[in-house]
Amino acid sequence: MKIGELAKVTKCTTETIRYYEKSGLLPMPERNESNYRLYNQTHEYRLNFIRNCRSLAMSHEEIRSLLILMDKPPADCSDVNYLLDEHINHVDTRLQELIELKEQLNHLQQQCQNEDVIDHCGILQGLQTMEHNEKKHSHLK
């Protein structure tokens, strides 16, 4: 199948498919005599796997590690389980960061008196004066 057909069956854009190829997550397909990419069912399964991992907020490196394990399976799936544990820890960290972010936003919102003119807006003043948190939020990566 050509790239457009693969995109259609996987509900993915052709740009995303090319991106996954360039990043090494999706193997490069063979090409026909007209130099069109020719994909097979293995590409379809792998692309669905990648997209499912991305829907679980897994990074490309996590997906790459899972693909390596999938391509060269060990005697058991303990390595896969370990990777999933690591990802769960990342999700827990992100949840805590989001809770802290929500608390900051709620605090800012409490500074607002709706009847104030914009020059006296507590939210805008708070955004100008609050301490900048140097901590990088994982959801911005």
Where are these regions (language model features)?
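Context-gated lysine
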Residues: K2, K8-K11, K22, K72, ...
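Basic helix-turn-helix/winged-helix DNA-binding cores
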Residues: M1-I68
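Residues at alpha-helix boundaries and short interhelical turns
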Residues: E33, A57, D71-P74, D92-L95
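The DNA-recognition helices of helix-turn-helix-type DNA-binding domains
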Residues: S23-G24, E33, M70, C112, ...
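C-terminal regulatory/oligomerization modules of transcriptional regulators
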Residues: A75-K141
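Short, charged, low-complexity amphipathic alpha-helix
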Residues: R64-P74, S78
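Alpha-helix boundary/capping residues
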Residues: R51-R54, M70, H87, C112
